[in-house]
Amino acid sequence: IEKRNIVIPFEMRGFGIEKRRHELYKIVKPSRYIKIYYRTSNIDVYTEGYVETCEISNFEELTNGQISIICPDPYWYSNSETVASYSQIIGGFSFPFPKSDEPFIIGQYNSQNLMTVFNSGDEIGCKIIIEGKSESDVSAVNPAIYNADTDEYMQIQGEVLNGDIITITTKTGNKTVTLEREGVKTNIINRLISGSTWLSLREGENNFYLRASEGLTNLKVKIIHINAYLGV
């Protein structure tokens, strides 16, 4: 996908134009990082890039100009994220505690290993976080995430120890597999099992389920998604 070029025209009116023009020069400098927000009644998104040029015609009757911004990543992203999660124990704490003597839920076992993510934008990658939680040293072995709609999967070979955090990013241009163990981060992309696919989220509903050779119930898994749009 090609990078995006955004051109923002503007016109300065009123008093103190020279001062405001110099203030603009201080902020909008060539090669400087910039984040652009766009909001309507139906959408609230942002994109990121760097300033290419800031051209101002200040010798005309009206002071106007344009800012050219280059965005290497052409997508517009929602300002909110969606998180689908799996854990064998689903927390149920709620405050204040009920005053009656009737039983109330403080947690419940999750018998489903299916996670559903709804993508309102264009097809895009996501972030997957796998965390080992168990009383033993080894939480799980060979964890895998399957796309129930396409039969594609990603599987990590080897053991997941208690306290391990594996972070997978599947976005084009930023595909990574990182293990955090005892505060040290390591690239473990070489532990992807042959046949694994960089999972993406299609438009609409996406269903995923979990598998592991051992210890599936000792895993906490999150799929983090931000809607992305090529056009707004």
Tell me what each language-model feature is:
Residues 1-4, 28-30, 59-63, 120-124, ...:
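Solvent-exposed loop and beta-edge segments used for protein-protein assembly and interaction
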Residues 10, 38, 51, 71, ...:
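Hydrophobic side chains in beta-strands
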Residues 77-85:
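Short, charged, solvent-exposed linker or helix-capping segments at domain edges/interfaces
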